[in-house]
């Protein structure tokens, strides 16, 4: 019986400010209009695993679906087996687990004199008919922040012969994410990211990851 878990790790470096929204339900008067999501313990920005998973799946659907899927449950088999499928007749647990990504270079940012791990960007929308301005404040995790990225991939008898194919899809997803954006307001310059120090490690069972590491660093 084959059973192993592979940890795929990397550093997510922000090349521009990142906005992934948090709750503003209890915002005080004069507070930021759109805060970022933060770790409730440290009050430091995080990148939710759900944001990474959703964005990567959306981008990969443009490549691996033969036609436009109205819902994720209509995705191709290769995406369904990696990300899961909740449709009753096609229900399938995904092979991937996306972890929340936490800030990893706080000390480096502190040494540069950074006073806050977020910034506030002031934006304005103008009503084209009345010319009335609608100013707003958007919070962003600052450029050059790095976050620990971790992805778990499960190998069983069912998918032992599909591992390399799956990892090529994962590699494509990361490349597409670098060429697109993460979070909101990407068309206005937010959310440009880079994945650095890519590495696959066997964390349970026995599986030789040499070929997988070669795939991860190969040009797409």
Swiss-Prot record:
GO molecular function annotation: endonuclease activity; RNA binding
Keyword Hydrolase: yes
EC class (word): hydrolase
Cross-referenced InterPro entries: CRISPR-assoc_RAMP_Csm3, CRISPR_Csm3_endoribonuclease, RAMP_III_fam
Effect caused by changing residue 139 to A: Wild-type degradation of target ssRNA by the Csm complex
Regulation: Target ssRNase is inhibited by EDTA.
Subunit description: Part of the Csm effector complex that includes at least Cas10(1), Csm2(3), Csm3(5), Csm4(1), Csm5(1) and mature crRNA. The Csm complex is elongated and slightly twisted with a maximal length of 215 Angstroms and a diameter of 75-80 Angstroms. It has been modeled to have a central protein filamant of Csm3 subunits along which the dsRNA helix of paired crRNA and target RNA binds. The filament is capped at one end by Cas10 and Csm4 and at the other end by Csm5; ssDNA is thought to bind to the N-terminal HD domain of Cas10.
Family designation: Belongs to the CRISPR-associated Csm3 family.
Protein's UniProt name: CRISPR system Cms endoribonuclease Csm3
Source species of the chain: Streptococcus thermophilus
Protein's gene: csm3
């Amino acid at each position: 019986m084959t059973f192993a878990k592979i940890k795929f790790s990397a550093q997510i470096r922000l090349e521009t400010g990142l906005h992934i929204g948090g709750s503003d339900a209890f915002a005080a008067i004069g507070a930021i209009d759109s805060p970022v999501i933060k770790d409730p313990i440290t009050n430091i920005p995080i990148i939710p695993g759900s944001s990474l998973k959703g964005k990567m799946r959306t981008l990969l659907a443009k490549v691996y679906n033969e036609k436009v899927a109205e819902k994720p449950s209509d995705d191709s088999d290769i995406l369904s087996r990696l990300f899961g499928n909740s449709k009753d007749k096609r229900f399938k647990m995904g092979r991937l687990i996306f972890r929340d990504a936490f800030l990893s270079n706080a000390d480096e940012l502190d040494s540069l004199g950074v006073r806050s791990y977020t910034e506030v960007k002031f934006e304005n929308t103008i009503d084209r008919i009345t010319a009335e301005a609608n100013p707003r404040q958007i919070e962003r995790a600052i450029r050059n922040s790095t976050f620990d990225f971790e992805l778990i991939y499960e190998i069983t008898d069912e998918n032992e012969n599909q591992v390399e194919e799956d990892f090529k899809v994962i590699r494509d997803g990361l490349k597409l994410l670098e060429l697109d954006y993460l979070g909101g307001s990407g068309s206005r310059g937010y959310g440009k990211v880079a994945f650095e120090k890519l590495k696959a490690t066997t964390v349970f069972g026995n599986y030789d990851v040499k070929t997988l590491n070669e795939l991860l660093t190969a040009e797409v």
